[in-house]
Amino acid sequence: GGCINHGQPCDGDKNDCQCCRDNGYCNCDGIFGLKWNCKC
């Protein structure tokens, strides 16, 4: 368990986004609804 730290990869799902410690969301590159390179 545990939360994902700032700068670590995440999958962009709600649980990951709520669990990012420092900024509270996942930032993803993406287009047409596809996401990649997601980081907290």
From Swiss-Prot:
Keywords recorded for this protein, A-Z: Disulfide bond, Knottin, Secreted
Domain of life: Eukaryota
Known tissue expression: Expressed by the venom gland.
GO CC terms in record: extracellular region
Signal sequence segment: none
InterPro entries, A to Z: Toxin_34 (IPR013605)
Function: Not toxic to mice by intracerebroventricular injection.
Designated name of the protein: U4-ctenitoxin-Co1c
Pfam families xrefs: Toxin_34 (PF08396)
GO terms for MF: toxin activity
Protein family according to the UniProt entry: Belongs to the neurotoxin 04 (omega-agtx) family. 03 (type II/III omega-agtx) subfamily.
Disulphide bridges: C3-C20, C10-C26, C19-C40, C28-C38
Compartment(s): Secreted
Written domain comment of the UniProt record: The presence of a 'disulfide through disulfide knot' structurally defines this protein as a knottin.
